[in-house]
Amino acid sequence: MEDSSLDTLSIVNETDFPLYNNYTEPTIAPALIAVAPIAQYLATAIGKWAAKAAFSKVLSLIFPGSQPATMEKVRTEVETLINQKLSQDRVNILNAEYRGIIEVSDVFDAYIKQPGFTPATAKGYFLNLSGAIIQRLPQFEVQTYEGVSIALFTQMCTLHLTLLKDGILAGSAWGFTQADVDSFIKLFNQKVLDYRTRLMRMYTEEFGRLCKVSLKDGLTFRNMCNLYVFPFAEAWSLMRYEGLKLQSSLSLWDYVGVSIPVNYNEWGGLVYKLLMGEVNQRLTTVKFNYSFTNEPADIPARENIRGVHPIYDPSSGLTGWIGNGRTNNFNFADNNGNEIMEVRTQTFYQNPNNEPIAPRDIINQILTAPAPADLFFKNADINVKFTQWFQSTLYGWNIKLGTQTVLSSRTGTIPPNYLAYDGYYIRAISACPRGVSLAYNHDLTTLTYNRIEYDSPTTENIIVGFAPDNTKDFYSKKSHYLSETNDSYVIPALQFAEVSDRSFLEDTPDQATDGSIKFARTFISNEAKYSIRLNTGFNTATRYKLIIRVRVPYRLPAGIRVQSQNSGNNRMLGSFTANANPEWVDFVTDAFTFNDLGITTSSTNALFSISSDSLNSGEEWYLSQLFLVKESAFTTQINPLLK
């Protein structure tokens, strides 16, 4: 249902940055009014930075009228979303910190706006302000209240990094020597790393705590971070450049059904991969394994959802994705416990006494919901009703996807639970097993083709994943179509055309994507390929650069190669030395035209290939995103510090 009382802010379409919705249901309401203007400005600024003016703009958005109104709104919105409230004493402390930051910010901002100001004085005010923000930041890392404080911490970091970039670009105009500028470049790079590390510490702490209570609570918190936090963490690293596009492809999640706890290792090891499904395919069909049991007269008949089997296009028959999700054509079997290629579910049934129920005692159905004509579900109505006769046992489900009624409960009316988000569509539907251990102790060396199978006695939940509309084009066309009107494109690593067998899904939300690809030990090349096509009217003589974001914890002697592949017309775009670096780094290719690559028409299908030769034991590397940008629009304004 819409809440017309919310003054939602429309996001400029060209930013492609879904950061708000106007529904009071489901969990992620109310609308993201507080952060939307900041996100919109950052998306514009990263495309074209307003030198020496960006800090002033961000300051006015975070502290409009020299008041902490935006930060207060962030706090109250987040408190509502995740049901966590700061004490009044803590709120008073934060308000005092806001006043201190506002005071020194206003002094600096007002001074540099004066005509004919003295650069040496501006330098002093700048250093005072930078030091004040650094000194006060720990107040926004509140132990046991990480859920609320992480959103406040994020905006204070954004303010500081914007200040540093303006100072770097201002240079002598603000009284800085080249040595000063060099020190600010070093500080900026250090703080991007430091702030992201501290942010992820808060996220991991709170997410792990909430998941131990309930996976639903954990997903609600993750939704908040996917909108209020992680896109800004991605913006920090993009502030090094001018001309790139800030785009979030993070999904939102809705959980319906019996609450189950999971630990953080279970999330990273299996649950996240089950939720994600086939990462580079669209959802086409959903099968719900449903049972109806007749019980003694004093216990109502029950409907149970025993399992959810999503089918993607093209179908692999998998319920989830670990590794690259393939079930055959393995190059070799791994004997080191690293290769987990497939997750399948087998189902059996139990009565309230946890005794097996024979199939003849069950009215069991597989209910299938096909995809609608437009290829994408936009909403769902999924509900469950609990019996009072037997604690925590479900006795009614109602499932409707789009306009398709999948299951109409036999237990009477169930109130609607409308699941939808402006700018999002349903890309994945799954369920998390309840009553089974997800902390596997299998000897992986004995598993045929390294396949894990498990039993799921009582699922009784449904988890719906909503992807932002900026991903629809890829999932419908299976290629990345380029238009001459856009200066920059973002290609998430998971939107691949092909990937080598030795690849794994890694949860990296601070990259503003649903995950990265991890390449692990293999005797052959590690490779991911991305399909590229040109829209009609594309100028194939325009010069572009390709930027790949990777993380290489251990040195790769063979380095990383970037190539274009087009019907045997292969061209090396770049070959990079991959020294050990635990942080994300960007490799930038030399400029090229699509004429150079032999891609001259919209009918030509080409591939960008990112690869490395065989990895030894202990070696691995990660691929997060690709950025394609016009050479004329792209500038590296702050050189990264490479280890």
Curated annotation (Swiss-Prot):
TM stretches of this protein: none
GO biological processes: sporulation resulting in formation of a cellular spore; symbiont-mediated killing of host cell
Alphabetical list of InterPro entries matching this protein: Pest_crys, Pest_crys_dom_I, Pest_crys_N_sf
Keyword vocabulary terms for this entry: Sporulation, Toxin, Virulence
GO molecular function: toxin activity
SUPFAM superfamilies: delta-Endotoxin (insectocide), N-terminal domain (SSF56849)
One Pfam family here: Endotoxin_N
Superkingdom of this protein's organism: Bacteria
Family recorded in the similarity comment: Belongs to the delta endotoxin family.
Its job: Promotes colloidosmotic lysis by binding to the midgut epithelial cells of mosquitos.
Remaining remarks: Toxic segment of the protein is located in the N-terminus.
Designated name of the protein: Pesticidal crystal protein Cry11Aa
Organism field: Bacillus thuringiensis subsp. israelensis
